[in-house]
Amino acid sequence: MLSVTKPALKRLSRRLVRKGAADGMALRFKRREGGWTLRVEHESPGDTAFSHDGRTVLLLDAEVSKAMADMTLYARKVGQRSQLKLRRTERRGD
């Protein structure tokens, strides 16, 4: 399953506020040419949900969850801002 760091969850929460997302809405990873994008959507049955301070901030459907099984979402500081980044998680013992 995708691993998400606490700073990344906080960044997702701030992004939802900035976008004016209504209660019950969260960011969902979607495939796009050359990578991934985040869209504000409602939670669907079967989604994997990640929360921050009691609010769902990130959603993955089953297909995306499988594709991101060996990845970590983290926040990287760039100047005064933080950016969300994905990286492959190192497997131990392989």
Residues of each region from the PLM?
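Short, structured protein-protein interaction patches enriched in aromatics and acidic/basic residues
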Residues: 22-53
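Flexible, active-site-adjacent loop/turn segments at secondary-structure boundaries
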Residues: 2, 48, 66
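Short, low-complexity, intrinsically disordered N-terminal segments
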Residues: 14-27, 60-61
